[in-house]
Amino acid sequence: MVDAKQRLLSAAVDYVAEHGVGERSLRQIAAGLGTSHRMLIYHFGSKEGLLVEIIRTVEARQREVLADLAHEPGESAGDMARRFWRRISDPALWPNVRLFFEVYGQALQGRPGTTHLLDDVVHAWLDPVIALGIAQGLSEEDARVMARLGLAVTRGLLLDLLATGDREAVDAAMEQYIVSYEAQLPGRTSPLS
């Protein structure tokens, strides 16, 4: 059974995906969810607390997508990465991506209520991506380095896409990264050599 907090959080994720957050107050968000701001404060502590939980939920869902893609039989590492990129760079997710970067920036500046986002914003991704790299044949050391690089490239290109809207150039950059990643896998030769 899903508790009230989980129902509110799920509704908030959907609300942000459809409407974004922008300058909406906690009262406005609550009204959009059909609840009171007091209920949101009770469950999440503050507007910032709610936004951090929305981000964590969206990020967890994205990691689930990655895990599901990793279990596709016969699919190359590059094909899996391309499908994941298409999924997370889908314009339907842009409100969530904008929220991620907004709150991430606030957390880096030390804004109260947001700093606990920093606890797992990188590390929650590393272990599953490292495991994926090892499964694809990388050494643990190489998988660790490539996981961090892949996370940085992906987030950087998402930011580029939001800032410029240049889908063609951003997709070309991601394709180049994927090709260079595949070249690191055992049994592959570098297309750059």
Task: Please tell me what each predicted stretch does.
Residues M1-A4:
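Short, Lys/Arg-enriched anionic-surface-contact patches
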Residues R7, A11-E18, E64-D68, L99, ...:
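Solvent-exposed, amphipathic alpha-helical segments
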Residues R7, A11-G49, E53:
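Helix-turn-helix
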Residues E53, L66-V97, M146-G150:
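Hydrophobic alpha-helical connector segments
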Residues R56-Q62:
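Short, basic, alpha-helical segments at the C-terminal edge of helix-turn-helix-like DNA-binding modules
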Residues P73-S76, Q109-P112, V122-A147, E182-S193:
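Hydrophobic alpha-helical bundle segments that form small-molecule/ligand-binding pockets
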Residues A77-D79, A92-P112, H116-D119:
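Amphipathic alpha-helical segments used for helix-helix packing
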Residues N96-Y104, D127, E140-L161, A172-S180:
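Hydrophobic alpha-helical segments that form the core
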